[in-house]
Amino acid sequence: MRHRKSGRHLSRTSSHRKAMFQNMAVSLFEHELIKTTLPKAKELRRVAEPLITLAKTDSLANRRLAFDRTRSKAIVGKLFNDLGKRYATREGGYLRILKCGFRAGDNAPMAYVELVDRAVGGEAVSAE
């Protein structure tokens, strides 16, 4: 029985899933808007939102935890210097998922994942 088991496997090994969501989170924080499949977008929330919550309290330990989860010094800097301050008063719900139709090749449901209160402008980066 599958009772109380959370998370989607997405037809990947655990190491592949971990690497994929790490890369997607880095792309999301870099561009603030990405386009991906709907199931991946929903699972990305579980990775990205805790990182923003972590960035609200700036400490060396939190920076090291964020680096451990993103492996990017530039993104850690943006998280703590920009995003942590931007969402200091918001109690969660940092991401918005917008459905945007279906992919041409396999009819997979697609979605935009964007940071709430982001500066408007720019193009979506595809993270498939």
Curated annotation (Swiss-Prot):
GO terms for molecular function: structural constituent of ribosome. GO terms for biological process: translation. GO terms for cellular component: cytosolic large ribosomal subunit. It comes from the Bacteria. InterPro entries: Ribosomal_bL17, Ribosomal_bL17_CS, Ribosomal_bL17_sf. The keyword Nucleotide-binding does not apply. The keyword Ribosomal protein applies. Pfam families: Ribosomal_L17. Belongs to the bacterial ribosomal protein bL17 family. This is Large ribosomal subunit protein bL17. It comes from Pseudomonas fluorescens (strain ATCC BAA-477 / NRRL B-23932 / Pf-5). The gene is rplQ.
